[in-house]
Amino acid sequence: MESSSFEDVNRLVRSELYEHMDPEFGKYLAMNLPGCGNIIGVRLDDLKEIARQIADINWKEYLKHAPDDTLEDVVIQGLVLGFAQGKLEEILAYADEFVPKIDNWWVCDSFCSTFVAASMYPEIVWEFIMKYMGDSELNPAWRKKEEAEIPEGQGGIAVGTWQDMSDDFRLRFVAIMLKCYFVNDKYIDKCLYAFEHMQDGGYYAKDGVAFGLAESYFVFPDKTI
């Protein structure tokens, strides 16, 4: 596509957003997302419908050129990734670019709840998620660094882009992904161990862990207590 084509697509998306604008919902978001500017006020169901249309056409090209101008622009990017069809490695590569944009609970939770690749490829997506545990034995790249005995500050850790995120939303992303897709017989013990070791985040990370533990208790009360 030419750049003018992307501009046309972005104009169409922006037009759709304003057609679905709900001022009262915008006020609700503004109250519950402190510090988040440029909110249009579009409900999640409407954003999902826009994202599905994009995902069905050319999700990769859209994400390469998608703007970050408003809250809804960023939410749509996460939803498009959730609905994307294609090679898993490509989807995860784009997800690695997207996850550092998470800076509030609405972007985080809407993305996590629609990322169906986690249901289809749990083992691979688990490893992907664990990169965002940072300097933790749950992080496969961190384990490799420790096993190789690389001195601190040398060699680097191939952990994607988690260093660019606040601990709060990096860990909330992990917690909500675990809550949505991994509270099951195969992963419950790993989930509970991960929740126990997510103490570095702030309010939103702890809130995500609380959601994860609540889901764990509902499904596996004896293990969770």
Locate predicted features.
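Alpha-helical scaffold domains
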Residues: 1-225
